Amino acid sequence: MSKGEEKHSMKTYRKYRFAWLAAGILALGLLAGGLMNVIADAKTKNADVMITSLDRVTLAFTGDLQFTGTVAEQIKKNGTSYPFTDVKPILARADIAVGNLETTLTTRGAAQNKQFTFRSDPRMAQAMADSGYDLVGLANNHTMDFGQDSLLDTIKHLQKAKLIPMGAGKNLTEATQIHYITKRGKTIAFLNYSRVLPSTSWMAGANKPGLASAYNPKGMYSKVREARKNADMVIVFIHWGKERMTVPEAYQTEMGHKLVDAGADLVVGHHSHIMQPVEWYKGKLIAYSLGNFVFTKSKMDLCNQTAILEVALNGKRIQANLVPAHIINGRPRLMTGAEKASFLNFIDRISPKATVKSDGTIVPSP
């Protein structure tokens, strides 16, 4: 058994143990007078949890993670688990949790000639694993901030923590690899690409370390079609768009639709540092950007507001839900009450092709 499989096996055991408990609760409900859709919170008072059937696969997605600056200061004071203390129950309850790592995890390399360069403590790889993450997207504009060695170090530290790095590798084959994970008889394919890179030198080559590029998307669409033949669900995790803009760029909409047309069931974006619309297109979901997640404070408060996207695959049906959070001192804290209602209303207003309900559920617009 590989290290990744070992971690998924342990996580599956925990999910099954919880699912048998859930089945018992539902059985009691039947005896009381009828089957209900039970929404409860098993681990925290601040978030909605769907108690699921044994054949249902649940996923959680977050936006940008980086552990530098004021975030690093808080980690030094409070430990590596600090950024995830409030959201760990949400991540851990998912069968598969995915995040975008917007930093290198290394102690070496020279800063590249760019405005912002991020280098974080390699111990944060294990902190992410301990918090519930399973896959980590590396195709973005920061994972080579300190050169090729910093990227390879980042991959090494993630793998040591039994996390699966996506969208990067020592060559193009590794960077564009489709990652398949099977849960409860369902095979899910994950692909990770970036449409935002500082230089073509960051693109992986036949014999060159680098990232999976979406600038020429034909190869990406081909990979999606390949994944479609081998998986029950195809997910594209993509870095794209314009910073601090709630409206997607025209190319995002075009590319998102073409990804679905090629076979993607779910497209999840990041890079804008701010939440962008959610959209149902041909029965498939596109979340254009999940914004920041673990990040330094922004002067623009909308950049400090984020959400975990929860997705459930039940048969061939996809259900989706947003769990809002507010980034305070570098740590996402779950929203409640009026703040949560206001945030979800905002996402609903900027999403003309979806309806976001007061409980965070995302459904097609009437």
Predicted regions and their residues:
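Acidic, metal/ion-coordinating pockets
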Residues: S2-P366
